[in-house]
């Protein structure tokens, strides 16, 4: 099952403070959306998403995969989704599942991301 690329997403209380912390660990900003209270940072081949006020909990986000196909295959293996696949107002498809410990696994793919992922097998150049 091809889930796409994965990114840890952290719910932060103070975006500026969190960015400063991660920059001290040699992360660099590759997606600067501070005006909307979120940012994407990179360290080597890892991307880290920081959100202030956009998500309720820390999660793993998979992007680029076929959300409906992931749902169908995972469901056939007995996994239950807490949010089945749906088309979001922004044009992306999303679904959500929890692991046995309650951790959120979020699948979210925009049409252009799917096409790019199919062509290159990646969404971010590291």
Regions flagged by a language model, labelled:
Residues 1-16, 58-60, 110-126:
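N-terminal beta-strand motif that seeds the catalytic metal site of vicinal oxygen chelate
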Residues 2, 9-47:
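Core segments of cupin and vicinal oxygen chelate
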Residues 2-5, 23, 54-57, 83-84:
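A short, structure-level motif marking secondary-structure boundaries and short turns
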Residues 13-15, 61-104, 109:
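Vicinal oxygen chelate
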Residues 33-34, 52, 118:
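Conserved catalytic-core motifs of eukaryotic protein kinase domains, centered on the activation segment
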Residues 34-37, 56, 88-93:
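Short acidic/glycine-enriched loop/turn segments that link adjacent beta-strands
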Residues 40-45, 52-53, 97-100, 110:
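Active-site beta-strand termini and strand-to-loop segments that position acidic
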Residues 47, 55-56, 67-69:
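Short, charged/polar surface micro-motifs in flexible loops or helix N-caps
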């Amino acid at each position: 099952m091809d889930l796409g690329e994965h990114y840890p997403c952290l719910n932060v209380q103070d975006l500026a403070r969190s960015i400063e912390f991660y920059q001290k660990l040699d992360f660099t900003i590759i997606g600067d959306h501070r005006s909307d209270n979120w940012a994407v940072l990179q360290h080597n081949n890892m991307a880290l998403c920081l959100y202030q006020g956009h998500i309720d909990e820390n999660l793993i986000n998979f992007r680029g995969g076929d959300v409906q196909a992931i749902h169908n295959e995972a469901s056939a293996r007995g996994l239950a989704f807490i949010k089945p696949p749906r088309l979001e107002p922004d044009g992306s498809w999303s679904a959500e599942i929890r692991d046995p410990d309650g951790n959120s696994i979020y699948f979210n793919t925009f049409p252009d991301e799917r096409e790019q992922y199919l062509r290159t097998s990646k969404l971010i150049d590291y």
